[in-house]
Each structure stands twice: as C-alpha cells, then as structure tokens.
Swiss-Prot record:
Keywords: Cytoplasm, Lipid biosynthesis, Lipid metabolism, NAD, NADP, Nucleotide-binding, Oxidoreductase, Phospholipid biosynthesis, Phospholipid metabolism. PANTHER family: GLYCEROL-3-PHOSPHATE DEHYDROGENASE, GLYCEROL-3-PHOSPHATE DEHYDROGENASE [NAD(+)] 2, CHLOROPLASTIC. This is Glycerol-3-phosphate dehydrogenase [NAD(P)+]. InterPro entries: 6-PGluconate_DH-like_C_sf (IPR008927), 6PGD_dom2 (IPR013328), G3P_DH_NAD-dep (IPR006168), G3P_DH_NAD-dep_C (IPR006109), G3P_DH_NAD-dep_N (IPR011128), NAD(P)-bd_dom_sf (IPR036291). Pfam families: NAD_Gly3P_dh_C, NAD_Gly3P_dh_N. GO terms for biological process: carbohydrate metabolic process; glycerol-3-phosphate biosynthetic process; glycerol-3-phosphate catabolic process; glycerophospholipid metabolic process; phospholipid biosynthetic process. The active site is at K194. It is found in: Cytoplasm. It comes from the Bacteria.
Length: 336
C-alpha cells in the first residue's frame, strides 16, 4: 500500500479548513495549524471547527496543532490560507520549518499592499523557492458549500504542469473537481480583482440598484480584470474560465461571499468601521482594492470600478456620489 500524501494547512479559517477537508476526503493525511490552542483542541476532540465552520463534521484523517514545526514536518504540500496582507510575516517564520521539497500552495486571493505583488510572488520572495514549487488553488469556491460537500470545480495553477497534476490528484474528490492551468498570473489576478468587483456589486445591491446594475458591474469588472491581465502577460482565455468568470459570478451572486456582504452593508449606509465590526472573517477586497489599483496604475491600466471602490472604502466618498461619477465618465467603445 502506498504512503498517503501528507498535507499541512496553515490557517484554520473557513476556506483553509474546508480545503483541508477536501484533501482529507481525497485520501491525504492533513494537519491544520491553528494559532489558538482552544481551536486546535476543538478540531481534535469534537471533529469540528466551531469558530469558522460550525456544525460541519471534519474527517478523521484531519487533525490540528498549534506547533508549526509539527504541521510542516514531511508535508508533500504546504497550504497557505492566511489573510493575504499577513502572508509575508507569517511565512518568514515558517520557512525554516518547511520540508525540503514541499510544494507551497496559495489559497489566498489578494495583492500585497506596498509591493503590489501577487501572492505567489510573495511566496517566492520569502521562501526563496522557484515558481515550479508554488501552486495556486482558485475558482468559485465558497467555503461553506464545499464544507457541505456540494459540487464545485476549481483551478490548480502552477508553472510546472506536472506539479499541478500532482496537486490535482491530491484534491480530487467526488464533489470537488480541479482543473490544471499553467497561467498563474491570470488565475491569481482573477481571484484578486473579483474580490474588488464583489465589493462593488455588494454596494450596488445594498443601494437597491437592481439586476441591470449588477450585470453591468460584473461584465465591466471582468473587462477590467482582463485588461490588467493582458498587460501582465496572462492568457485571455483564463478570464472566461473558473478562475475568472466562474469565481466572479459566485462572489457577486452569493450571500456567502464575505466581499459581497461587506459591500452590501456599505451600500445600506453603514460606515467602514461599523461594517468591519460586524464582519467576522477577512473580506480580502477591502485592503486589496488599494493594491489592485496600485498594480493597475503601475501598468498604465484604467480600472474605473476598482477606483470607485477605493473611493468609497478608503476615501469616505458617499456611494451615491461615487456612482454618479462612474456613470458620467466619457462615452467609449465597449471593447476598450
């Protein structure tokens, strides 16, 4: 009998835990790293994550520890599932503990503030490993649905197709269907920008602007993503796939989406601080909208929806005023 694949998941939020379940259901031995002892104890003693996936029974071949060295030991895959703006600091602490040939897997959908780096670039910069040992899992993957073992598809992206195929095999279950892709740039941009567009659609929903507005924001948001991706060397087909349109539609349509919910609260008139106070988990788009806009400006790409979201979230611009400015921009051909 072959030895089971070993996976370490650093982060016990809803998505890290849900993906750990996927790996376990696919036959891997999974260890979750938890920052808090009480959460690790709950996972091990009750087979649940009461903080982030209450009521979901976790597989027997998934356990938790607060010791990062124990989690990382001999792991074939080291999955990173922490808030994107904390990745650099956390990973710097974990790098000395990592197994020599482990594949680093990013579940994060963001762009780092200041550097405007994608998450795989941060991993490469901090861990000093080549792109052939860094993979990304992305797509329309709402954690609560996956934890309920509802059908979902995803993209496993890596510059090395063989590594992508290894990870694909390690997380393929009857309910979770991963596809491989070597376009890491496009896959990561799709995930990062959709969080920003999810905020925009949520704001529109909170304002009661209707489905025409939602459809327009989704479509033009996809156009913004594609423009940025093309300038950065991404494959345009990526944006019509799971990492682009698929993820965007799920985020902009579901009440389970943290970014959509965050935007909805802003659109209903809550202040930024009030919205943060009622948001239990990280809505990545709140911080990443600034870094996505920074990235776009570095590449000379016009992203008006992203700019509008930054104005509302970080500059205190009233949504009604921001909407008026967005709608009164000069007319242009659609395919620009």
């Amino acid at each position: 009998m072959s030895t089971p694949v070993k996976a370490a998941v650093f982060g016990t939020g809803s998505w890290g835990t849900a993906f750990g379940m996927v790996l376990a259901d696919a036959g891997c031995d999974v260890t979750l790293w938890a920052r808090r002892a009480e959460l690790a104890d709950a996972v091990n003693s009750t087979r649940t994550n009461p903080d982030y996936l209450p009521g979901v029974e976790l597989p027997e071949n998934l356990r938790a520890t607060t010791d990062p060295a124990e989690a990382a030991r001999a792991a074939d895959f080291t999955v990173l599932a922490v808030p994107s703006q904390t990745l650099r600091g956390n990973l710097a602490e974990w790098v000395p503990l990592l197994a020599p040939d482990t594949v680093l897997v990013s579940l994060m959908k963001g762009v780092e503030l200041g550097s405007a780096m994608r998450m795989s670039e941060v991993v490469e910069d901090v861990a000093k490993v080549g792109a052939d040992r860094i993979a990304v899992v992305t797509g329309p993957n709402l954690a609560r649905e996956i934890a309920a073992r509802m059908p979902a598809a995803a993209v496993v992206a890596c510059a090395n197709e063989a590594v992508a195929q290894r990870l694909q095999a390690a997380c393929h279950t009857p309910y979770f269907r991963p596809y491989t892709n070597t376009d890491v740039v496009g896959c990561e941009l799709g995930g990062a920008v959709k969080n920003v567009i999810g905020l925009a659609v949520g704001i529109a929903d909170g304002m009661g602007l209707g489905d025409n507005a939602k459809g327009s924001l989704i479509t033009r948001g996809l156009a913004e993503t594609t423009r940025l991706g093309l300038v950065m060397g991404a494959d345009p087909l990526t944006f019509s796939g799971l990492a682009g349109l698929g993820d965007l539609v799920a985020t902009c349509s579901s009440p389970l989406s943290r970014n959509h919910t965050f935007g909805t609260n802003l659109g209903r008139g809550m202040t930024l601080q009030e919205t943060i106070a009622v948001t239990k988990q990280t809505a990545e788009g709140v911080k990443s909208c600034e870094s996505v806009l920074d990235l776009a400006r570095r590449h000379g790409v016009d992203m008006p929806i992203t700019e509008t979201v930054v104005g509302i979230v970080h500059e205190g611009k009233p949504p009604v005023v921001a909407l008026k400015e967005l709608m009164s921009r000069s007319a242009k051909p659609e395919r620009r």
